[in-house]
Amino acid sequence: MSKRRIAPLTFLRRLLLRILAALAVFWGGGIALFSVVPVPFSAVMAERQISAWLGGEFGYVAHSDWVSMADISPWMGLAVIAAEDQKFPEHWGFDVPAIEKALAHNERNESRIRGASTLSQQTAKNLFLWDGRSWLRKGLEAGLTLGIETVWSKKRILTVYLNIAEFGDGIFGVEAAAQRYFHKPASRLSVSEAALLAAVLPNPIRYKANAPSGYVRSRQAWIMRQMRQLGGESFMTRNQLN
């Protein structure tokens, strides 16, 4: 009887290990491949597209146009760093002080959860994982973030982030956002336009770049101040990000 009970458990354990090994190979290959190859689509884009089809929205198209960092305004990269991750050039994927502050805040305010994800973590999640909050996803995100930080340069992380970030319903990547909202290529985005796009992150479905609320305008102004305090374009050059 004991052997019959152990056999299914052994089978499940081996199956789980094989699945994890397969995922590790898949994600590792993806990290290596996308260190040099443009990203055609992300996990979040696929998730949005499938959800739309399942909901009967057959006209929905998750749209993205890949562009190199040379074809993105330096203000855009600076804007997302100022808004989301000011220690981006310094850390190895995790901003520990920010995480500690977020945990302390969340213990006091369970109804208003604050995140502390870096641009590297957001890139790993958007590219390979799914939306939602769970310890499983955060654990996988941590491993993928370490892989990305080990293999990719900071400039590459920022390039991929800007090309797969969600800026509105079906709008992925800064080129698609620039064309949709400002009718110009991403290379010509101004300081204020870049700050406005960064202001709707990381919740571009709730906050609209084409119909900014008072909160979004206030955040846009704050981001522009932070961009100046970081040093403007010289920050990007100094940290080899453009």
Swiss-Prot record:
Q: Which reaction does it catalyse?
A: [GlcNAc-(1->4)-Mur2Ac(oyl-L-Ala-gamma-D-Glu-L-Lys-D-Ala-D-Ala)](n)-di-trans,octa-cis-undecaprenyl diphosphate + beta-D-GlcNAc-(1->4)-Mur2Ac(oyl-L-Ala-gamma-D-Glu-L-Lys-D-Ala-D-Ala)-di-trans,octa-cis-undecaprenyl diphosphate = [GlcNAc-(1->4)-Mur2Ac(oyl-L-Ala-gamma-D-Glu-L-Lys-D-Ala-D-Ala)](n+1)-di-trans,octa-cis-undecaprenyl diphosphate + di-trans,octa-cis-undecaprenyl diphosphate + H(+)
Question: Which enzyme class?
Answer: transferase
Q: What pathway is this protein a component of?
A: Cell wall biogenesis; peptidoglycan biosynthesis
Q: Could you confirm whether the keyword Ligase appears in this record?
A: no
MF terms (GO), sorted A to Z: pentosyltransferase activity; peptidoglycan glycosyltransferase activity
Tell me its EC number(s), please: 2.4.99.28
Q: Which PANTHER family match?
A: BIOSYNTHETIC PEPTIDOGLYCAN TRANSGLYCOSYLASE, MONOFUNCTIONAL BIOSYNTHETIC PEPTIDOGLYCAN TRANSGLYCOSYLASE
Q: What is this protein called?
A: Biosynthetic peptidoglycan transglycosylase
Q: Which organism is it from?
A: Salmonella heidelberg (strain SL476)
